[in-house]
Amino acid sequence: QWIPGQSCTNADCGEGQCCTGGSYNRHCQSLSDDGKPCQRPNKYDEYKFGCPCKEGLMCQVINYCQKK
């Protein structure tokens, strides 16, 4: 279980969340909604500035979620 103020990994975050942030400021955040900033899923499952989109949405080239 992730504790606010501590660094996380995706395994620490709950369902519908990812671990995002820089090296020293990682935190659990909800998956991105329509029109919200996002980061595309990657093979390392690491995110620096946002989570992937919620199901049914895709992260566009401009890094915002839109309906598929």
UniProtKB/Swiss-Prot annotation:
Q: Does the keyword Disulfide bond apply?
A: yes
Q: Which GO terms describe its cellular component?
A: extracellular region
Disulfide bond entries: 8-19, 13-28, 18-51, 38-59, 53-65
- What keywords sit in the KW lines? Disulfide bond, Pyrrolidone carboxylic acid, Secreted
UniProt KW Secreted keyword: yes
Q: Where in the cell is it found?
A: Secreted
Task: Provide the family line.
Answer: Belongs to the u-CNTX family.
Protein name (database record): U19-ctenitoxin-Pn1a
Task: Tell me which species this is from.
Answer: Phoneutria nigriventer (Brazilian armed spider)
